[in-house]
Design a protein with these regions (language model features):
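FKBP-type peptidyl-prolyl cis-trans isomerases
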Residues: 1-183
């Protein structure tokens, strides 16, 4: 499967920049004791959170609002799949609608900033995902059903573009974690 190059993928993403392109400094002191693969995932997550703090530029607030709406829509669909409503789930968890909206807004902000930071990192370092990166992403999305997912994605241009963005960010995140200074 071919991925789009960064220029094509970036056409639909704001061009945020970073205040610094130096390697991030991270601590693994709080990392759970786990297998090497889980530790590497933790390292990538911590590195992306650290990098997200460097995002600068004028980011349209609508991007954050759209991401929060997506999170809320997904939560509503999950609630319905469980035979309940989001409102009922919030009541069960003693979370007010106002608290939930603030939580999802913060989650969306973190998610958007991490994505934009990884985009900027990829642009700066000229990172392009490998075929292996594409397959790892597909495997993580549908373990054991990779072929079916590839066929499904090839029929939907929007999903294919979303996959291209995700794979490019995954490759950037791998590079970021590999260059991180662990303290």
């Amino acid at each position: 499967m071919e991925t789009k190059n960064s220029a094509q993928v970036q056409a639909n993403i704001p061009n945020a920049s970073l205040s610094s392109y130096e390697p991030v400094k991270i601590s693994l002191a709080d990392a759970p004791s786990a297998e090497a693969e889980q530790l590497e995932g933790y390292k990538r997550a911590v590195a992306a959170m650290e990098l997200a703090m460097r995002v600068c530029g004028d980011i349209d607030p609508a991007i954050y609002e759209q991401a929060a709406l997506g999170i809320r829509t997904q939560a509503q669909a999950q609630a319905e799949a469980q035979g309940t409503t989001l409102s009922a789930m919030l009541v069960d968890q003693k979370i007010s609608l106002e608290q939930y909206e603030r939580m999802t807004a913060l989650q969306a902000s973190d998610m958007v900033n991490q994505g934009l930071a990884l985009d900027a990192w990829a642009r700066h370092y000229g990172i392009e995902p490998s075929e292996e990166d594409v397959m790892k992403m597909i495997e993580s999305m549908a373990p054991g059903h990779e072929k079916e997912l590839l066929e499904e994605l090839s029929q939907d241009l929007a999903q294919l573009e979303a996959l291209s963005i995700a794979v490019m960010r995954f490759a950037a995140n791998k590079h970021l974690a590999a260059t991180a200074i662990v303290e």
